[in-house]
A protein has these predicted regions:
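Mixed-charge, glycine-accented linear interaction segment located at domain edges/termini
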Residues: 152-168
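N-terminal strand-loop-strand beta-hairpin
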Residues: 1-129
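Hydrophobic, well-ordered secondary-structure segments
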Residues: 104, 143, 161-165
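Conserved, surface-exposed functional patches that form binding/active-site neighborhoods
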Residues: 110-154
Length: 168
């Protein structure tokens, strides 16, 4: 499934932003804690000019905790990047994983090295099918992410096609 993703840094107090969403009718639908380990075979090639390339060649070991339930996954994200280096869409491949440490060890045997570890808390707000995720990232700050899945993209394309057919 292809997703359109927009992620921006929150430039105001988080509590103020969350209050604004609540006033607009958004409701908290879930919270989770995420511990991501990015691994790559391209670590030795990493420089300021090729970060997106190295990330595209990375796998992600993820431990997600939701409602005291742990979910462990191995993920590959195939990101589509524009000429400015912005991620404009991505397709994910997820596999369930019983043991993140063993998975990390397995990937190390085939020359994958840890690129970065990212830990964050997520609070997801929803209204009318629109979800906004506040991500409190350790040592980085708060980001807001919007993801539009393939179903919504198809619906938007259908609406555009209907508009065009009315004109023709």
């Amino acid at each position: 499934m292809k997703q359109i993703e927009i992620t921006v840094r929150l430039n105001e107090d988080k509590q103020t932003a969350m209050k604004k969403l609540s006033e607009l009718g958004y409701k908290v639908i879930r919270q989770s804690d995420v511990d991501d380990i990015y691994m790559t075979t391209k670590l030795d090639e990493l420089n300021a000019d090729n970060i997106q390339y190295v990330l595209k060649k990375s796998i992600l070991l993820r431990k997600l905790t939701v409602n005291n339930t742990e979910i462990k996954k191995i993920t590959y994200k195939n990101k589509e990047i524009d000429s400015n280096g912005n991620v404009i869409s991505e397709q994910k491949v997820n596999l369930n994983c019983e043991d993140i440490d063993k998975a990390k060890k397995l990937f190390s045997y085939v020359d994958f090295k840890e690129l970065v570890r990212v830990k964050y808390h997520v609070t997801v707000y929803e209204k009318d099918g629109i979800e906004l995720a506040f991500q409190d990232v350790e040592n980085l700050g708060t980001l807001i992410e919007y993801e539009n899945n393939d179903r919504v993209v198809k619906e938007e394309n259908k609406i555009e096609e209907e508009k065009v057919s009315k004109i023709l």
